[in-house]
């Protein structure tokens, strides 16, 4: 593995050369507290950005082991770190100038769901974060001075502010993991009680619009019919009450614009856990469930 200083020298040696000279940067580099891997280099500044990976060993990141000791906690932490890295790196996107996609810093988009993603992976050795960078050029002539800014100024700040425990608010991390553990408790209770779904009272089910998955402002909170109400004791939040849907055939009935489709869509998405503030944090559906549309001669 080469040292960061060697990368810096290589960058300066290829400045103003033809764009394909960037290909020689592919490889692994040791920075003071982390390792940088340039895994794929784009063919020209207008092509898809180059693929990079950063590895931070646990000895440097120093997140408590209890944050990632089991899969549930680990997925929650991975999701939180990826969102934080994406938020901070967005501030530096296109700060380096050039043609085409020069200066872009891009991370996989995180929606409202908490998912296991390859963009952030916690292993026994440490934290891996995968992202894309547009290597800068003027036309098709290398501008390695701008890439040097990205690799030696912007990225170290992104890593420091998002992947080191000392820089991530403790309370924020605790809340993410506690929510994930409470969601797991509800999933376990569904199986024990013979239920297929749970919708907590107070949940915000409507979305802002048809092309947005964000919660609608000033929406009417969900309230379960008394006949279907159940209470579940959670690990961190305490008891929570809402609607339990049993296995079998359930008919959603009501007048026009009364929220039938909204409830059905929330149940459909309930196979995934959602982030705090989404409104559907405690809308939980059996993770083996799937949605089928009605069609002529389809038998269900």
List the predicted regions and their residue ranges.
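N-terminal pre-Walker A segment at the start of P-loop NTPase domains
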Residues: 206-241, 284-300
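Post-Walker A helix-loop "phosphate-sensing" segment adjacent to the P-loop in P-loop NTPases
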Residues: 269-280
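N-terminal accessory targeting/assembly segments
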Residues: 1-194, 205
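Intrinsically disordered, low-complexity regulatory segments
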Residues: 110, 115, 181-184, 188, ...
């Amino acid at each position: 593995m080469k040292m960061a200083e060697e990368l810096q020298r290589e960058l300066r040696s290829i400045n103003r050369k033809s764009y394909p000279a960037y290909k020689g940067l592919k490889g692994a580099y040791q920075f003071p507290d982390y390792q940088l891997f340039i895994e794929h280099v784009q063919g020209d500044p207008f092509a898809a950005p180059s693929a990079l990976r950063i590895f931070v060993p646990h000895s440097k990141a120093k997140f408590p082991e209890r944050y990632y000791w089991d899969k549930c906690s680990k997925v929650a932490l991975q999701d939180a770190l990826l969102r934080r890295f994406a938020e901070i790196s967005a501030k530096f996107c296109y700060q380096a100038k050039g043609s085409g996609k020069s200066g872009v810093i891009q991370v996989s988009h995180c929606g409202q769901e908490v998912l296991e993603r390859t963009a952030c992976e916690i292993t026994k050795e440490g934290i891996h974060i995968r992202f894309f960078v547009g290597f800068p050029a003027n036309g098709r002539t290398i501008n390695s001075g701008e890439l040097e800014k990205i690799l030696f100024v912007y990225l170290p700040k992104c890593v420091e502010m998002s992947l080191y425990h000392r820089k991530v608010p403790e309370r924020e991390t605790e809340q993410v993991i506690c929510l994930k553990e409470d969601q797991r408790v509800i999933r376990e209770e569904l199986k024990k009680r013979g239920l297929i779904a749970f919708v907590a009272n107070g949940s915000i089910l409507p979305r802002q619009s048809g092309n947005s998955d964000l919660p609608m402002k000033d929406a009417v909170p969900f309230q379960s019919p008394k006949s279907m109400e159940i209470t579940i004791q959670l690990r961190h939040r305490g008891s929570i009450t809402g609607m339990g849907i049993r296995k079998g055939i359930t008919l959603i009935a009501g007048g026009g614009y009364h929220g039938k489709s909204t409830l059905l869509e929330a149940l459909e998405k309930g196979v995934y856990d959602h982030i705090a503030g989404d409104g559907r944090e405690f809308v939980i559906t059996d993770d083996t469930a799937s949605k089928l549309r009605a069609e002529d001669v389809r038998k269900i």
